[in-house]
Amino acid sequence: MLLAGQHGTAISAAELAPDKLAASASTDTRHQGTSCLAVDRYFLDEVWAKVGAQSCLKCHKPGGDAEDSKFVLQDPSRDASPGQGASLQHNRAAFRQMALQRKNNESTMLLKATGELDHGGEDVLKPDSPRYRVLAEYVRGVRAAQEGKLEAQPLPAVAEGPPFFEGIEMLDNRRLLRRLTLTLAARLPKAEELAAVQKDGLKAMDTVLDGVMREDAFYQRLAEAFNDIFLVRGYDDGAESALSYDHFSGTRHWTQKHNLDDIVDEKARQKARYKLADDYREALLREPLELLKHIVRNDHPFTEIVTADYIMMSPYTARGYGMFEQLKDKFTDTEDPYEYIPVRLPSLKSRNVKEHQVSESGFYPHAGMLSVFQYLRRYPTTETNRNRLRARMYYQHFLGVDVLELAARVSDAAAVTAKYEIPTMQAGECVVCHKTLDPVAGIFQDYYSFTGVFGPRKDGWFKDMFGAGFEGDDLPPEQRWRSLQWLAEHTVKDPRFATTMVEHVYYILTGRKVLLPPKALDDPDYEAKRRAYQAQRKETEAIAAKFVKANFNLKTAIKGWAASPFYRADDIATAMKNPKRHAELADLGLAHMLTPEQLERKVAAIFGQPWGRLMDKQFAILYGGIDSKEVTERAMDPGGAMGAIQRSMANDVACKNVALDFSRPAAERRLFPKIETDLAPGESVEGDQRIREAIVHLHEVVLGRYDDVSSAEVKRTFDLLAGIISDAQSRKGLEKVESYYCKPSGQERPADPKYTIRAWRAVVTYLLRQRDFLFE
């Protein structure tokens, strides 16, 4: 049986997606034929995606402002059932039931949506808006199906596109391996790794990644990347301010009194004390990220990012906590500021005995990142903010929810304030956010000290806020002493936690955040953008399922994305020829500029030494870096200053390394192992072939490209080299030696009678300014 679409397009029942139909099967068994399938498909792809998820769910859900109404939906992102089928089936039934209700022979659903009947959300849809038309079409279709008239008035057809990755080339396995080893371990692939991948393809990648993820460089990158997300290094007043004066006043400044009498010279002693303090502060800043590294390194469930009942301490930070004497025997080297071990803090003791921390266990109630002092200092509170910043960041970091996107901004704040005594608890446009945000803010109520971290509000918690809890569950009074642990336990059971951690891994690998569902239905590219979002979302959820099955081992998520076509997509030129696919594929493929840290590591991996200038924090900010405080977003698109830095880097690195490489024995060279400086283009056919082979090697080492010796790219580089040498030979008075500034350190200026060293230096400069080097 065939249905006619809106424009006469035939749609067979077999073409209607089986997984979606299963997920939204009607509870009403009277309508299970093809007509009902059309209603299902239209509901999922149109009504739910465009209306329900965007306009209804924020209030009509457990814990939402309309949770006591008869129209209560379930959030699919919190549904752990296969394909989120349980929630989608529930929502379809709820919509269908509401669509059949009438008031004065008009649809109750449409009247409420436009604010013509009593509706707490007022007019969420404007009459004749795109979303209203979708909902009206659905109501008409449901009533027609109920009356057996659907075939006379068919629902619009939902267009099918080509397979999402049709026309997309995947990255060569060698290039994929190079990308992964540079990204995760700051090195080029080893010969045995390349051989394994060449032999077994993607099957070998898991084993290779197992080795990569045991390297120290991987954990350095992991900490750096998660700081981009948590920004935990960016709090004010010095690192030691995380240890509150009220609880650690006698120990947090231990470096000022540390015995350095063995250093006789006063200036040297003062310098040593400065270094001691700097190392101590750096050790404190690293603590939250060392927790993350410890979890991953030891294959612990990544749920410990919020449930760990310990923090990480080094010999230096242990002194700050006043715990060094009891821990010193557990350290391998008590003078190493960056050796960390897991430690449980005793409950906090205040200078005022009445304000000691209450703890039934006798320990500080650790809850992973949620309770570490540095995280709490990074996201402080005020008398007016009332921990709402902390609640907002909790949702963003651990559940992937941007609370500010739950509802539109209040249109007339003065009018709302005048109308309601407590707008955040009474005004619908305020409640939609605050009923989610404020209960979590209340969870943090005992962490209210502005200058420190722990300390309940002296006047008790606010009465004009929704009570402490999480998503409709109230915090039991007996759990208040461990409220953050209670929150953590609820967090890791929420399917959004696993999905969010997988999204973080995507950001770490690609430098981009996952796609959000498009909102503007009148955007001509809406369908293409939605298809791109759905494809990426499906992949994210599939990797999240593997992540959960692997007991939340973060390495599983990394491997999942590494093998994903979203990470491996390479040449999209063919697909981009279709304008409709241009919007669909706009975010596909890796094309983000390397961060300052990544660029320095890439230079070091290829040339054996870093450039060095981007290690300066202020200079790095000019190249898109962050300080985790004022500058918190990395600039991914190069501007004028960044372009100038790229040119300077290319010139400096080539100058420092080309003559140096030629000065080494051929077997030890990175750049020019099979060519000497006495060989110039145009001298012989054999010589030109050797030069082209040297260029192929350079392209592989510097750019990660495996170009054929006869390729256009190799010809372009060859012509550049030949042109420079030809131009030099046509000039008079040029020196026959390399520049003084580019000579190897401690050596004489190397002879360069044919200008080949300088020409090769120009070639390397050219390659270092290529997109393949500067971008990932």
Which residues make up each language-model segment?
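Substrate-binding clefts and substrate-entry loops adjacent to catalytic sites
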Residues: 514-516, 520-524
